[in-house]
């Protein structure tokens, strides 16, 4: 029987994990369901007075899991005294890696791996929808749709909505330029066949950003599908445990630190599209687009394309090699550099995006006097919902177009 293998890292998560587990274990699936939970912390925390609350919470989590007496739930204890991380390799990245390594020992290539977070609940029918998708299509990887819930805190909601709009704006642009790196990096929203996990090398042990680099490696080895009619609900909460990720982004937003998450203008993505359109020509000759010029300086190599040409015997081979070289990280670095040259505001860039791609937007009043700082939460939430709906349509069409070979 095929297995659904869910991986959840957990540190100080007793306030969230029971609800997450309930949403997963109450699902009716035809596959064998296993939920692996890695309760983790640096071992040195046992000796640090200011970490005792987290240490105690982790012990409570371990007891909670053990008391479930549910064969579907497998505990990985990297928190008890003497079992925690050595300081140099602590973090969610190593937790995800240990989860993946443990799962791979007991998995077949056609089993389905799902990356989750302890604070994320799933929409009813989510697991069966994933099953059906992987049953009826030759799909290797799925970037799962997501939606952050509102909470009873205006500043937190404002920051979350601003961040989610940033994420959706970014993916919408990537899909519009047909980038092979069209995905949103959320550790709670990834599903893939075990065969694809193996091909991509699994998670690495970065302190954070491990979901981005895992998806980037997956995108280099296979297509990432985007559409599912169910979604996951990552928690809307503050966190300073890692330097990146949703919790840190929301905390930064509450503190007014938004420079890491610019709402990109369509103009900067057009510069990527311009280069994409010339990839076949670049196989034959040098063409200095703005993106190519940036890469020459960024890579400290005026001739970075020549080895790609030398190792390619056709345009299609060169095209693949180009995308392997100019990957999701390089694209993001270029976009940030180009966006920094522009004097437009985040609000202006969002309005331009919506007016360019979705001129039929019904409530144009939403865009009038738009301000991430001052517009009402209701207004920002309507914009978020509008972008979610449009993104879902684009996800669906992107998958269909790639399936029939039109992109």
Predicted regions, residues:
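Acidic donor-binding/catalytic loop of UDP-sugar-dependent glycosyltransferases
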Residues: 109-110, 116-133
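A conserved hydrophobic helix/loop-capping motif in glycosyltransferases and polysaccharide synthases
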Residues: 4-16, 20, 27, 36-42
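Catalytic donor-sugar/metal-binding loop of nucleotide-sugar-dependent glycosyltransferases
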Residues: 206, 218-233
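A recurrent flexible, glycine/aromatic-enriched loop bordering the glycosyltransferase active site
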Residues: 171-191
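Active-site-proximal specificity loops/subdomain of glycosyltransferases
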Residues: 45-110
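Conserved donor NDP-sugar-binding/catalytic core segment of glycosyltransferases
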Residues: 125-161
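Terminal low-complexity segments of carbohydrate-biosynthetic enzymes
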Residues: 252-407
């Amino acid at each position: 029987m095929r297995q659904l293998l869910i991986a959840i890292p957990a540190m100080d998560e007793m306030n969230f994990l029971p609800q997450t587990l309930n949403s997963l274990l109450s699902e009716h699936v035809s596959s064998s369901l296993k939920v692996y939970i890695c309760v983790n912390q640096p071992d040195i925390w046992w000796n640090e007075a200011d970490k005792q609350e987290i240490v105690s919470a982790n012990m409570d989590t371990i007891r909670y899991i053990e008391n479930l007496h549910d064969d579907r739930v497998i505990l990985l204890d990297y928190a008890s005294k003497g079992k925690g991380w050595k300081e140099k390799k602590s973090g969610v990245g190593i937790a995800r890696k240990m989860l993946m390594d443990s799962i791979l020992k007991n998995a077949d290539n056609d089993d389905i791996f799902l990356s989750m977070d302890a604070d994320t609940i799933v929409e009813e029918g989510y697991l069966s929808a994933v099953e059906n998708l992987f049953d009826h299509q030759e799909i290797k990887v799925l970037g799962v749709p997501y939606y952050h819930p509102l909470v009873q805190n205006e500043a937190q909601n404002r920051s979350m909505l601003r961040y989610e709009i940033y994420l959706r704006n970014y993916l919408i642009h990537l899909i519009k330029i047909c980038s092979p790196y069209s995905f949103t990096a959320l550790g709670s929203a990834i599903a893939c066949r075990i065969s694809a996990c193996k091909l991509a090398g699994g998670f690495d042990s970065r302190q954070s950003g491990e979901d981005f680099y895992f998806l980037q490696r997956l995108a280099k080895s296979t297509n990432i599908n985007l559409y599912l009619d169910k979604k996951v609900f990552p928690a809307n909460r503050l966190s300073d445990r890692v330097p990146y990720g949703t919790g840190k982004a929301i905390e930064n937003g509450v503190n007014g630190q938004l420079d890491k998450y610019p709402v990109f203008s369509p103009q900067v993505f057009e510069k990527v599209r311009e280069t994409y359109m010339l990839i076949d020509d670049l196989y034959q000759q040098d063409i200095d687009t703005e993106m190519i010029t940036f890469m020459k300086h960024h890579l400290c190599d005026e001739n970075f394309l020549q080895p790609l040409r030398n190792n390619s015997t056709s345009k299609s081979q060169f095209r693949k090699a180009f995308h392997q070289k100019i990957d999701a990280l390089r694209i993001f670095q270029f976009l940030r550099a180009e966006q920094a040259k522009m004097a437009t505001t985040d609000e202006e860039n969002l309005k331009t995006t919506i007016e360019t791609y979705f001129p039929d937007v019904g409530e144009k009043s939403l865009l009038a006097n738009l301000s991430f700082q001052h517009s009402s939460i209701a207004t920002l939430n309507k914009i978020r919902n509008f972008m979610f709906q449009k993104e879902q349509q684009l996800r669906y069409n992107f998958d269909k177009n790639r399936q029939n070979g039109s992109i």
